[in-house]
Amino acid sequence: MVLLAVGELSASLSLLEECWHYLFLGIIQGLTEFFPISSTAHLKVIPLLLSWDDPGVAVTASLQLGSIIALIAYFWNDLAFLMRGISKASFQNSWNNQNTKLASAIVLGTLPIVFAGMLIKLFWQGYETSPIRSIPAIAVVSIVMALLLLIAENVGRRTRNFENLSFWDGQIIGFSQVLALIPGVSRSGITITTALMIGWERKSAARFSFLLGIPAITLAGLVELKQAFGSFELVDVFPLLLGITSSAISSWIAIDCLMKFLQTQSMMIFITYRFLFGTLLLFWYYLAF
C-alpha cells in the first residue's frame, strides 16, 4: 500500500508538472505567434533556459491550433464579410471589387510558403536538426530582423491601406512570408515589415499579415499534426488541451493588443526587444556552452 501510494503521488506530481509546462508553453505560443518576435524561437529557447525537454514538433503543432482558433475567431466578421462579398461578386459576375482583390491577395500570398514548405519536407530531411535552427542562428536572425523592422519604420510612407490593395501586394508580402520558415524570423514580423516597406500604414499592415496568416498557420499546423499523429498517450490529453486553451486565450489577447497598439504607436518596442533578445541570447550561448 505504501509503494502504491508513493507511485500515485509521483504520477500526480508528474501530471501536475506536465500541465504547468503545457499551460506555460501555450501562453508563450500565443503571445509570440502574433507579436512580431517569433514563436518558433521562443518555444525553442525558453524550454532550454528553464532546463525543460524540447517540446518537439508534435507539441508545438498542437499548441498552434489554439492560435489558429483565436485568429479565426478574432477576424470572423472580416472573413464572413469577405465570403459574402465573393459570393455576391460571383452572382453579379463582377470581380473588380475590394473583397475579391483581398481574397486573391491572400490566396496568391499563401502559395509561395506552401510550395517552399513542401520542398523542405521533400528534399531537406535534416531541416529539424540543421544549423539554421541552432541557438546562435536564431540570435543572429533576431538581430537582423530588428534592423529590417527599424528600416521599414523609417523608410515606409505609411499612406496605404486596404483601399489601395494591389495584385503585387499579395505577391510581394507572400514571398517575404517564405522567410518565416527560418526560425527567429517571425511570420508576422516579416510580413508586417514588408508591408511597411511598400508603404502600408501599421494597423493595415498587421491586419493583412494576420488574414494572410490564417491559411499559412492552419496548413502548417495540420501538416505537423498529421506527421505527429499517434505520438500522444492518453495521459497527455488533458495537459495538451490545457496548452491549446492557454494558447487560444493568449493569442486573442496578443492580436487585440497589437491591433490597438499600432493605432497610435510605432514598432520600436518590438525592434528594441528583438535586438536585446538576440544579443543576450548570443552572450548566454557562448558563455554557457
Swiss-Prot record:
Bacitracin is thought to be involved in the inhibition of peptidoglycan synthesis by sequestering undecaprenyl diphosphate, thereby reducing the pool of lipid carrier available. Belongs to the UppP family. The chain crosses the membrane at residues 23-43, 56-76, 104-124, 135-155, 165-185, 210-230, 235-255, 269-289. GO terms for cellular component: plasma membrane. Its main location: membrane. This is Undecaprenyl-diphosphatase. Its EC number is 3.6.1.27.
